[in-house]
Amino acid sequence: MKKRVGQYLMDCLSNVGVDKVFGVPGDFNLTFLDDIISRDDLEWVGNTNELNASYAADGYARLKGIAAMVTTFGVGELSAVNGIAGSYAERVPVIQITGAPTRAVEQAGKYVHHSLGEGRFDDYRNMYASITTTQAYITPENAQSEIPRVISAALFEKRPVHIHLPIDVANTEIEVTSSFELAGHQHRDVSKHMQMIMEKLQSADQPVIITGHEINSFGLHEELEKFVTQTHIPVAQLSLGKGAFNEESPYYMGVYDGALADKAIRDYVDQSDAILNIGAKLTDSATAGYSYQFDIDDVVMINHHNFKMNETKDTDVSLVDLLAGLNKLNYVNHMDFPKYQRPSAHDYDLNDDPLTQETYFKMMQDFIKEEDVIIAEQGTSFFGAYDLALNQHNKFIGQPLWGSIGYTLPATLGSQLADPNRRNLLLIGDGSLQLTVQAISTMIREEIKPVIFVINNDGYTVERKIHGENAMYNDIKMWDYKLLPTVFGGKEQVCTYDVNTSEEFQKVLLQVEAQPDRMHFIEVKMDVHDAPQKLNAIGQAFAKQNG
Protein backbone atom coordinates (compact mmCIF):
# COMPACT_ATOMS: atom_id res chain seq x y z
CA MET A 1 0.00 0.00 0.00
CA LYS A 2 1.34 3.41 -0.97
CA LYS A 3 1.36 6.17 1.62
CA ARG A 4 3.14 9.46 2.07
CA VAL A 5 5.89 9.36 4.68
CA GLY A 6 3.96 11.88 6.77
CA GLN A 7 0.91 9.63 6.70
CA TYR A 8 3.00 6.64 7.72
CA LEU A 9 4.49 8.57 10.64
CA MET A 10 1.02 9.50 11.87
CA ASP A 11 -0.13 5.88 11.48
CA CYS A 12 2.71 4.81 13.76
CA LEU A 13 1.86 7.43 16.37
CA SER A 14 -1.81 6.49 16.29
CA ASN A 15 -0.85 2.85 16.83
CA VAL A 16 0.85 3.70 20.15
CA GLY A 17 -2.12 5.68 21.44
CA VAL A 18 -1.49 9.26 20.34
CA ASP A 19 -4.75 11.01 19.47
CA LYS A 20 -3.68 14.65 19.88
CA VAL A 21 -0.70 16.36 18.22
CA PHE A 22 0.55 19.65 19.68
CA GLY A 23 2.55 22.33 17.94
CA VAL A 24 2.75 25.51 15.88
CA PRO A 25 2.46 25.73 12.08
CA GLY A 26 5.39 26.97 10.03
CA ASP A 27 6.23 26.97 6.35
CA PHE A 28 8.36 23.81 6.60
CA ASN A 29 5.58 21.71 8.14
CA LEU A 30 2.36 23.00 6.55
CA THR A 31 1.73 20.23 4.01
CA PHE A 32 2.58 17.68 6.70
CA LEU A 33 -0.06 19.28 8.91
CA ASP A 34 -2.55 18.71 6.08
CA ASP A 35 -2.04 14.99 6.61
CA ILE A 36 -2.71 15.39 10.34
CA ILE A 37 -5.92 17.41 10.10
CA SER A 38 -7.34 15.11 7.41
CA ARG A 39 -7.44 12.17 9.84
CA ASP A 40 -10.33 11.06 12.01
CA ASP A 41 -8.11 9.39 14.64
CA LEU A 42 -5.88 12.41 15.34
CA GLU A 43 -6.62 15.98 16.38
CA TRP A 44 -4.29 18.90 15.76
CA VAL A 45 -3.99 21.12 18.85
CA GLY A 46 -2.38 24.35 17.74
CA ASN A 47 -0.55 26.18 20.51
CA THR A 48 0.29 29.83 20.96
CA ASN A 49 4.02 29.09 20.95
CA GLU A 50 6.34 26.10 20.82
CA LEU A 51 7.32 26.30 24.49
CA ASN A 52 3.69 25.92 25.49
CA ALA A 53 3.33 23.09 22.97
CA SER A 54 6.25 21.22 24.54
CA TYR A 55 4.81 21.65 28.03
CA ALA A 56 1.36 20.55 26.83
CA ALA A 57 2.86 17.46 25.19
CA ASP A 58 4.62 16.63 28.46
CA GLY A 59 1.38 16.90 30.44
CA TYR A 60 -0.46 14.79 27.88
CA ALA A 61 2.23 12.09 27.96
CA ARG A 62 2.13 11.86 31.76
CA LEU A 63 -1.41 10.51 31.43
CA LYS A 64 -1.36 8.88 27.99
CA GLY A 65 2.13 7.38 28.14
CA ILE A 66 3.45 9.15 25.02
CA ALA A 67 2.89 12.41 23.14
CA ALA A 68 3.79 14.07 19.85
CA MET A 69 4.45 17.66 18.84
CA VAL A 70 5.35 19.37 15.57
CA THR A 71 7.45 22.49 15.05
CA THR A 72 9.10 24.17 12.14
CA PHE A 73 12.84 24.14 11.53
CA GLY A 74 15.13 26.33 13.66
CA VAL A 75 13.02 29.00 15.29
CA GLY A 76 10.29 26.54 16.18
CA GLU A 77 12.32 23.58 17.34
CA LEU A 78 14.62 25.76 19.44
CA SER A 79 11.64 27.41 21.13
CA ALA A 80 10.67 23.93 22.35
CA VAL A 81 14.09 23.05 23.79
CA ASN A 82 13.27 24.00 27.39
CA GLY A 83 10.17 21.84 27.48
CA ILE A 84 11.87 18.88 25.81
CA ALA A 85 14.78 19.13 28.26
CA GLY A 86 12.30 18.95 31.13
CA SER A 87 10.73 15.85 29.62
CA TYR A 88 14.18 14.30 29.31
CA ALA A 89 15.10 15.08 32.91
CA GLU A 90 11.86 13.71 34.33
CA ARG A 91 11.53 10.77 31.88
CA VAL A 92 8.48 11.72 29.85
CA PRO A 93 8.30 10.33 26.26
CA VAL A 94 7.58 13.08 23.71
CA ILE A 95 8.07 12.68 19.96
CA GLN A 96 9.42 16.04 18.75
CA ILE A 97 8.92 16.30 14.98
CA THR A 98 10.61 19.12 13.09
CA GLY A 99 9.42 20.02 9.62
CA ALA A 100 12.59 20.97 7.75
CA PRO A 101 13.66 22.40 4.36
CA THR A 102 13.82 20.05 1.40
CA ARG A 103 16.75 17.69 0.98
CA ALA A 104 17.81 19.63 -2.12
CA VAL A 105 18.07 22.86 -0.14
CA GLU A 106 20.02 21.14 2.64
CA GLN A 107 22.38 19.32 0.29
CA ALA A 108 23.13 22.54 -1.58
CA GLY A 109 23.92 24.33 1.68
CA LYS A 110 21.68 27.25 0.80
CA TYR A 111 21.26 30.20 3.14
CA VAL A 112 17.64 29.55 3.96
CA HIS A 113 15.47 31.45 6.45
CA HIS A 114 15.39 30.07 10.02
CA SER A 115 18.97 28.83 9.58
CA LEU A 116 22.11 30.35 11.07
CA GLY A 117 23.14 31.52 7.61
CA GLU A 118 26.15 29.20 7.46
CA GLY A 119 24.78 26.58 5.08
CA ARG A 120 24.66 23.93 7.80
CA PHE A 121 21.50 22.00 8.62
CA ASP A 122 22.59 19.73 11.45
CA ASP A 123 23.23 22.44 14.07
CA TYR A 124 19.80 22.18 15.70
CA ARG A 125 19.77 18.39 15.57
CA ASN A 126 23.11 18.41 17.37
CA MET A 127 21.64 20.70 20.04
CA TYR A 128 18.90 18.14 20.62
CA ALA A 129 21.36 15.27 21.03
CA SER A 130 21.85 15.91 24.75
CA ILE A 131 18.15 16.26 25.58
CA THR A 132 16.67 13.39 23.56
CA THR A 133 17.36 9.69 23.90
CA THR A 134 17.83 9.29 20.13
CA GLN A 135 17.39 11.25 16.91
CA ALA A 136 16.48 10.42 13.31
CA TYR A 137 16.82 12.11 9.93
CA ILE A 138 13.94 10.64 7.94
CA THR A 139 14.25 9.75 4.26
CA PRO A 140 11.91 7.74 2.01
CA GLU A 141 14.39 4.89 2.17
CA ASN A 142 14.69 4.65 5.97
CA ALA A 143 11.22 5.75 7.11
CA GLN A 144 9.94 2.23 7.82
CA SER A 145 12.95 1.41 9.98
CA GLU A 146 13.81 4.73 11.60
CA ILE A 147 10.32 5.82 12.64
CA PRO A 148 9.55 2.58 14.55
CA ARG A 149 13.06 2.71 16.03
CA VAL A 150 12.73 6.16 17.56
CA ILE A 151 9.17 5.61 18.80
CA SER A 152 10.30 2.36 20.43
CA ALA A 153 13.24 4.17 22.03
CA ALA A 154 10.95 6.86 23.45
CA LEU A 155 8.69 4.24 25.00
CA PHE A 156 11.51 2.06 26.35
CA GLU A 157 13.53 4.93 27.82
CA LYS A 158 10.53 7.13 28.70
CA ARG A 159 12.33 10.08 27.21
CA PRO A 160 11.88 12.41 24.22
CA VAL A 161 13.17 11.72 20.73
CA HIS A 162 13.80 14.11 17.84
CA ILE A 163 12.64 13.50 14.27
CA HIS A 164 14.02 15.69 11.47
CA LEU A 165 11.50 15.50 8.62
CA PRO A 166 12.33 17.40 5.40
CA ILE A 167 9.08 18.62 3.93
CA ASP A 168 9.67 16.91 0.58
CA VAL A 169 10.20 13.62 2.42
CA ALA A 170 6.94 14.06 4.32
CA ASN A 171 5.16 14.43 0.96
CA THR A 172 6.91 11.50 -0.76
CA GLU A 173 4.95 8.31 -1.33
CA ILE A 174 6.48 5.02 -0.23
CA GLU A 175 5.33 1.44 -0.49
CA VAL A 176 4.45 0.38 3.05
CA THR A 177 5.60 -3.23 3.17
CA SER A 178 5.12 -4.09 6.82
CA SER A 179 2.85 -3.15 9.70
CA PHE A 180 4.23 -0.99 12.48
CA GLU A 181 5.75 -2.96 15.34
CA LEU A 182 7.52 -1.75 18.44
CA ALA A 183 10.98 -3.14 19.06
CA GLY A 184 10.81 -5.97 21.58
CA HIS A 185 12.27 -5.50 25.05
CA GLN A 186 15.38 -7.59 25.56
CA HIS A 187 15.02 -8.89 29.10
CA ARG A 188 18.12 -9.23 31.25
CA ASP A 189 18.88 -11.91 33.80
CA VAL A 190 18.94 -10.08 37.14
CA SER A 191 19.26 -13.11 39.40
CA LYS A 192 22.70 -12.03 40.66
CA HIS A 193 21.38 -8.59 41.52
CA MET A 194 18.47 -10.15 43.40
CA GLN A 195 20.75 -12.50 45.33
CA MET A 196 22.74 -9.51 46.57
CA ILE A 197 19.57 -7.69 47.63
CA MET A 198 18.21 -10.80 49.35
CA GLU A 199 21.38 -11.20 51.40
CA LYS A 200 21.19 -7.55 52.46
CA LEU A 201 17.55 -7.82 53.48
CA GLN A 202 18.11 -11.03 55.45
CA SER A 203 20.81 -9.36 57.52
CA ALA A 204 18.83 -6.13 58.03
CA ASP A 205 16.84 -5.08 61.08
CA GLN A 206 15.14 -2.01 59.62
CA PRO A 207 14.61 -2.13 55.82
CA VAL A 208 12.86 0.65 53.93
CA ILE A 209 11.98 1.58 50.36
CA ILE A 210 12.41 5.10 48.97
CA THR A 211 10.54 5.48 45.71
CA GLY A 212 10.10 8.20 43.15
CA HIS A 213 9.36 9.44 39.66
CA GLU A 214 10.58 6.51 37.57
CA ILE A 215 7.71 4.41 38.92
CA ASN A 216 5.34 7.01 37.48
CA SER A 217 7.25 7.20 34.20
CA PHE A 218 7.28 3.45 33.61
CA GLY A 219 3.81 2.84 35.03
CA LEU A 220 5.08 0.30 37.57
CA HIS A 221 2.70 1.16 40.41
CA GLU A 222 1.09 -2.28 40.57
CA GLU A 223 4.43 -4.08 40.44
CA LEU A 224 5.82 -1.94 43.26
CA GLU A 225 2.74 -2.39 45.42
CA LYS A 226 2.83 -6.15 44.84
CA PHE A 227 6.44 -6.27 46.06
CA VAL A 228 5.63 -4.18 49.12
CA THR A 229 2.53 -6.19 49.99
CA GLN A 230 4.49 -9.44 49.74
CA THR A 231 7.48 -8.28 51.78
CA HIS A 232 5.87 -5.79 54.21
CA ILE A 233 8.77 -3.38 53.66
CA PRO A 234 7.53 0.17 54.41
CA VAL A 235 7.66 2.86 51.75
CA ALA A 236 8.56 6.53 51.84
CA GLN A 237 8.24 8.47 48.62
CA LEU A 238 10.01 11.58 47.42
CA SER A 239 8.23 14.74 46.34
CA LEU A 240 9.96 14.00 43.01
CA GLY A 241 7.60 11.15 42.20
CA LYS A 242 4.56 12.02 44.29
CA GLY A 243 1.97 9.35 43.52
CA ALA A 244 4.52 6.63 42.82
CA PHE A 245 3.09 4.56 45.66
CA ASN A 246 -0.46 4.09 46.88
CA GLU A 247 -0.85 6.46 49.83
CA GLU A 248 -3.76 4.40 51.14
CA SER A 249 -1.55 1.32 51.55
CA PRO A 250 -0.91 0.16 55.14
CA TYR A 251 2.80 0.07 54.26
CA TYR A 252 3.01 3.75 53.31
CA MET A 253 4.87 6.00 55.77
CA GLY A 254 4.71 9.37 54.01
CA VAL A 255 6.94 11.78 52.11
CA TYR A 256 10.64 11.67 52.89
CA ASP A 257 12.29 15.02 52.25
CA GLY A 258 15.40 14.83 54.37
CA ALA A 259 15.48 17.09 57.40
CA LEU A 260 11.97 18.38 56.60
CA ALA A 261 10.27 15.01 56.98
CA ASP A 262 8.14 14.19 60.01
CA LYS A 263 10.48 13.07 62.78
CA ALA A 264 9.20 9.49 62.91
CA ILE A 265 9.70 9.01 59.15
CA ARG A 266 13.02 10.84 59.15
CA ASP A 267 14.42 8.74 61.97
CA TYR A 268 13.23 5.47 60.47
CA VAL A 269 14.73 6.18 57.04
CA ASP A 270 17.95 7.76 58.26
CA GLN A 271 18.58 4.87 60.66
CA SER A 272 17.66 2.11 58.20
CA ASP A 273 20.30 -0.53 57.56
CA ALA A 274 18.81 -1.55 54.19
CA ILE A 275 17.54 1.26 51.97
CA LEU A 276 16.17 0.18 48.59
CA ASN A 277 16.00 3.23 46.34
CA ILE A 278 13.48 2.13 43.71
CA GLY A 279 12.98 4.51 40.80
CA ALA A 280 13.98 7.58 42.79
CA LYS A 281 16.66 10.26 42.50
CA LEU A 282 17.88 11.95 45.65
CA THR A 283 17.97 15.49 44.28
CA ASP A 284 18.54 18.71 46.22
CA SER A 285 14.92 19.86 46.12
CA ALA A 286 13.59 16.40 47.04
CA THR A 287 15.89 16.06 50.07
CA ALA A 288 16.03 19.66 51.35
CA GLY A 289 19.55 20.22 50.11
CA TYR A 290 20.80 16.62 50.57
CA SER A 291 19.92 16.74 54.26
CA TYR A 292 19.52 12.96 54.61
CA GLN A 293 21.60 11.40 57.38
CA PHE A 294 22.22 7.97 55.86
CA ASP A 295 25.35 7.03 53.91
CA ILE A 296 24.49 7.34 50.23
CA ASP A 297 27.08 4.69 49.37
CA ASP A 298 25.14 2.12 51.42
CA VAL A 299 21.90 2.67 49.50
CA VAL A 300 20.87 0.02 46.97
CA MET A 301 20.17 2.03 43.82
CA ILE A 302 17.50 0.38 41.68
CA ASN A 303 16.90 2.67 38.72
CA HIS A 304 16.48 2.38 34.99
CA HIS A 305 19.97 1.79 33.59
CA ASN A 306 21.47 2.09 37.03
CA PHE A 307 21.80 -0.71 39.54
CA LYS A 308 24.36 0.05 42.23
CA MET A 309 25.10 -1.88 45.39
CA ASN A 310 28.41 -1.63 47.18
CA GLU A 311 31.05 -1.94 44.45
CA THR A 312 28.69 -3.50 41.90
CA LYS A 313 27.34 -1.18 39.23
CA ASP A 314 25.27 -2.15 36.18
CA THR A 315 24.11 0.48 33.67
CA ASP A 316 22.66 -2.02 31.20
CA VAL A 317 19.61 -3.16 33.12
CA SER A 318 16.02 -1.90 33.02
CA LEU A 319 13.85 -0.87 35.94
CA VAL A 320 11.16 -3.18 34.55
CA ASP A 321 13.44 -6.22 34.86
CA LEU A 322 14.73 -5.19 38.28
CA LEU A 323 11.24 -4.79 39.72
CA ALA A 324 10.15 -8.09 38.18
CA GLY A 325 13.13 -9.68 39.93
CA LEU A 326 12.20 -8.10 43.25
CA ASN A 327 8.76 -9.68 43.02
CA LYS A 328 10.35 -13.13 43.02
CA LEU A 329 12.12 -12.62 46.36
CA ASN A 330 10.96 -14.75 49.27
CA TYR A 331 11.34 -12.28 52.10
CA VAL A 332 9.04 -10.84 54.77
CA ASN A 333 9.85 -7.88 57.02
CA HIS A 334 8.72 -8.14 60.66
CA MET A 335 9.99 -4.75 61.85
CA ASP A 336 7.36 -2.25 62.98
CA PHE A 337 7.40 1.17 61.32
CA PRO A 338 5.63 4.54 61.59
CA LYS A 339 2.27 4.55 59.80
CA TYR A 340 1.12 7.40 57.61
CA GLN A 341 -1.29 9.71 59.41
CA ARG A 342 -3.79 11.10 56.90
CA PRO A 343 -4.83 14.69 57.73
CA SER A 344 -8.12 15.29 59.47
CA ALA A 345 -11.02 16.68 57.47
CA HIS A 346 -12.13 20.28 58.05
CA ASP A 347 -9.03 21.06 60.11
CA TYR A 348 -9.42 24.83 59.74
CA ASP A 349 -11.63 27.75 60.73
CA LEU A 350 -13.74 29.74 58.30
CA ASN A 351 -13.50 33.49 58.90
CA ASP A 352 -13.02 36.82 57.18
CA ASP A 353 -9.31 37.09 57.99
CA PRO A 354 -6.86 37.14 55.05
CA LEU A 355 -6.46 33.63 53.66
CA THR A 356 -3.14 31.97 54.56
CA GLN A 357 -1.14 29.32 52.74
CA GLU A 358 -1.72 26.88 55.60
CA THR A 359 -5.50 27.20 55.48
CA TYR A 360 -5.52 27.20 51.66
CA PHE A 361 -3.89 23.77 51.48
CA LYS A 362 -6.01 22.35 54.30
CA MET A 363 -9.10 23.39 52.38
CA MET A 364 -7.64 22.00 49.18
CA GLN A 365 -7.19 18.66 50.94
CA ASP A 366 -10.95 18.49 51.57
CA PHE A 367 -11.70 19.54 47.99
CA ILE A 368 -9.79 16.71 46.25
CA LYS A 369 -11.89 13.89 44.81
CA GLU A 370 -10.95 10.27 44.13
CA GLU A 371 -10.16 10.57 40.39
CA ASP A 372 -8.75 14.11 40.34
CA VAL A 373 -5.54 15.04 38.57
CA ILE A 374 -3.60 17.52 40.72
CA ILE A 375 -1.05 19.67 38.89
CA ALA A 376 1.21 21.73 41.14
CA GLU A 377 3.47 24.49 39.85
CA GLN A 378 7.08 24.64 41.00
CA GLY A 379 6.74 27.31 43.67
CA THR A 380 4.53 27.85 46.68
CA SER A 381 2.00 25.54 45.03
CA PHE A 382 4.29 22.53 44.76
CA PHE A 383 5.85 22.88 48.19
CA GLY A 384 2.41 23.05 49.74
CA ALA A 385 0.81 20.40 47.54
CA TYR A 386 3.30 17.58 47.85
CA ASP A 387 2.15 16.97 51.43
CA LEU A 388 -1.48 16.60 50.34
CA ALA A 389 -2.82 13.10 51.01
CA LEU A 390 -3.72 11.41 47.74
CA ASN A 391 -6.29 8.74 47.10
CA GLN A 392 -5.21 5.62 45.25
CA HIS A 393 -6.59 6.82 41.92
CA ASN A 394 -5.41 10.43 42.05
CA LYS A 395 -2.72 11.55 39.64
CA PHE A 396 -0.15 14.13 40.75
CA ILE A 397 1.89 16.16 38.26
CA GLY A 398 4.81 18.38 39.19
CA GLN A 399 8.23 19.17 37.76
CA PRO A 400 10.54 19.41 40.78
CA LEU A 401 13.68 18.15 39.04
CA TRP A 402 13.65 20.40 35.98
CA GLY A 403 11.66 23.07 37.81
CA SER A 404 10.78 25.36 34.92
CA ILE A 405 8.23 27.85 36.19
CA GLY A 406 5.20 28.25 33.96
CA TYR A 407 5.26 24.58 32.98
CA THR A 408 2.03 23.54 34.65
CA LEU A 409 -0.45 25.83 32.87
CA PRO A 410 0.13 24.33 29.40
CA ALA A 411 0.80 20.94 31.01
CA THR A 412 -2.75 21.10 32.35
CA LEU A 413 -3.97 21.72 28.81
CA GLY A 414 -2.22 18.48 27.83
CA SER A 415 -3.31 16.39 30.80
CA GLN A 416 -6.95 17.50 30.49
CA LEU A 417 -6.98 16.66 26.77
CA ALA A 418 -5.43 13.28 27.53
CA ASP A 419 -8.40 12.36 29.72
CA PRO A 420 -11.27 14.87 29.48
CA ASN A 421 -13.39 12.87 31.93
CA ARG A 422 -11.11 13.49 34.91
CA ARG A 423 -11.23 16.75 36.83
CA ASN A 424 -7.92 18.62 36.61
CA LEU A 425 -6.97 20.92 39.50
CA LEU A 426 -4.16 23.33 38.64
CA LEU A 427 -2.38 25.04 41.54
CA ILE A 428 -0.17 27.82 40.21
CA GLY A 429 1.30 31.14 41.31
CA ASP A 430 1.11 34.55 39.68
CA GLY A 431 4.75 34.68 38.61
CA SER A 432 4.60 31.30 36.91
CA LEU A 433 1.29 32.10 35.23
CA GLN A 434 2.77 35.19 33.58
CA LEU A 435 5.32 33.06 31.71
CA THR A 436 2.86 30.87 29.80
CA VAL A 437 -0.48 32.63 30.22
CA GLN A 438 -1.43 32.27 26.53
CA ALA A 439 -2.24 28.61 27.23
CA ILE A 440 -5.55 29.83 28.69
CA SER A 441 -6.53 30.85 25.16
CA THR A 442 -5.91 27.32 23.88
CA MET A 443 -7.86 25.83 26.78
CA ILE A 444 -10.85 28.01 25.93
CA ARG A 445 -10.65 27.13 22.24
CA GLU A 446 -10.44 23.41 23.05
CA GLU A 447 -13.43 23.77 25.42
CA ILE A 448 -11.78 21.90 28.26
CA LYS A 449 -12.85 22.44 31.86
CA PRO A 450 -9.96 22.50 34.34
CA VAL A 451 -10.19 24.22 37.70
CA ILE A 452 -7.38 26.79 37.93
CA PHE A 453 -6.28 28.25 41.28
CA VAL A 454 -3.93 31.24 40.91
CA ILE A 455 -2.12 32.34 44.06
CA ASN A 456 -1.68 36.09 43.76
CA ASN A 457 1.06 36.99 46.23
CA ASP A 458 2.77 39.64 44.13
CA GLY A 459 5.96 38.03 42.89
CA TYR A 460 8.47 35.21 42.95
CA THR A 461 8.05 33.67 46.40
CA VAL A 462 10.56 30.82 45.98
CA GLU A 463 13.24 33.29 44.96
CA ARG A 464 12.35 35.57 47.88
CA LYS A 465 12.91 32.67 50.27
CA ILE A 466 16.32 31.93 48.74
CA HIS A 467 17.66 35.46 48.35
CA GLY A 468 16.41 39.01 48.00
CA GLU A 469 13.22 38.85 50.03
CA ASN A 470 12.42 42.48 49.30
CA ALA A 471 14.54 42.93 46.16
CA MET A 472 12.75 44.52 43.23
CA TYR A 473 13.87 41.76 40.84
CA ASN A 474 11.54 39.38 42.70
CA ASP A 475 8.58 41.68 42.09
CA ILE A 476 6.24 41.34 39.12
CA LYS A 477 3.68 43.65 37.53
CA MET A 478 0.30 43.21 39.18
CA TRP A 479 -2.34 41.94 36.74
CA ASP A 480 -6.10 41.81 37.11
CA TYR A 481 -5.96 38.02 36.81
CA LYS A 482 -9.68 37.31 36.93
CA LEU A 483 -10.11 39.26 33.68
CA LEU A 484 -7.72 37.01 31.74
CA PRO A 485 -10.36 34.51 30.55
CA THR A 486 -12.31 37.43 29.06
CA VAL A 487 -9.17 38.74 27.34
CA PHE A 488 -8.70 35.31 25.76
CA GLY A 489 -12.27 35.09 24.51
CA GLY A 490 -13.78 32.99 27.27
CA LYS A 491 -16.14 35.41 28.98
CA GLU A 492 -19.12 33.08 28.53
CA GLN A 493 -17.22 29.82 29.04
CA VAL A 494 -15.19 30.48 32.18
CA CYS A 495 -16.42 31.16 35.71
CA THR A 496 -14.08 33.62 37.43
CA TYR A 497 -13.69 34.34 41.14
CA ASP A 498 -11.76 36.66 43.45
CA VAL A 499 -10.88 35.17 46.86
CA ASN A 500 -9.44 36.96 49.90
CA THR A 501 -10.64 34.95 52.92
CA SER A 502 -11.36 31.37 53.92
CA GLU A 503 -15.09 32.11 54.01
CA GLU A 504 -14.97 33.37 50.44
CA PHE A 505 -12.85 30.40 49.39
CA GLN A 506 -15.34 27.92 50.85
CA LYS A 507 -18.20 29.55 48.93
CA VAL A 508 -16.18 29.40 45.71
CA LEU A 509 -15.32 25.73 46.18
CA LEU A 510 -19.01 24.94 46.61
CA GLN A 511 -19.81 26.84 43.40
CA VAL A 512 -17.11 24.91 41.54
CA GLU A 513 -18.56 21.63 42.80
CA ALA A 514 -22.01 22.67 41.60
CA GLN A 515 -20.81 23.43 38.04
CA PRO A 516 -18.60 20.55 36.85
CA ASP A 517 -19.35 21.38 33.20
CA ARG A 518 -17.55 24.74 33.35
CA MET A 519 -13.96 25.89 33.39
CA HIS A 520 -13.19 27.74 36.63
CA PHE A 521 -10.52 30.40 37.20
CA ILE A 522 -9.99 31.39 40.84
CA GLU A 523 -7.67 34.23 41.86
CA VAL A 524 -6.60 33.66 45.47
CA LYS A 525 -4.92 36.63 47.16
CA MET A 526 -2.33 36.01 49.87
CA ASP A 527 0.33 37.98 51.69
CA VAL A 528 3.55 38.51 49.77
CA HIS A 529 5.68 36.89 52.50
CA ASP A 530 3.37 34.00 53.35
CA ALA A 531 4.63 30.59 52.22
CA PRO A 532 4.23 26.91 53.07
CA GLN A 533 6.42 25.93 55.99
CA LYS A 534 8.49 23.57 53.89
CA LEU A 535 9.20 26.23 51.30
CA ASN A 536 10.72 28.44 53.99
CA ALA A 537 13.07 25.60 54.95
CA ILE A 538 13.86 24.68 51.32
CA GLY A 539 14.71 28.29 50.60
CA GLN A 540 17.22 28.31 53.43
CA ALA A 541 18.72 25.04 52.19
CA PHE A 542 19.10 26.38 48.64
CA ALA A 543 20.62 29.62 49.91
CA LYS A 544 23.18 27.61 51.87
CA GLN A 545 23.83 25.37 48.87
CA ASN A 546 24.48 28.41 46.67
CA GLY A 547 27.08 29.69 49.14
Model regions: which residues?
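Phosphate/pyrophosphate-binding active-site segments
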Residues: 138, 294-380, 490-547
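Active-site/binding-pocket entry motifs
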Residues: 103, 169, 380-382, 528
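N-terminal alpha/beta PP-like core and its mobile active-site loop of ThDP/TPP-dependent enzymes
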Residues: 1-330, 370, 449-452
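Short conserved AdoMet
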Residues: 155-156, 202, 369, 390, ...
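Thiamine diphosphate
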Residues: 97, 107-118, 258, 310, ...
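Conserved thiamine diphosphate
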Residues: 63, 114-156, 271, 335-347, ...
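N-terminal cationic-hydrophobic initiation segments that often serve targeting/anchoring roles
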Residues: 61, 154, 228, 269, ...
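Active-site diphosphate/adenylate-binding microenvironment
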Residues: 6-18, 24-27, 32-37, 340-421, ...
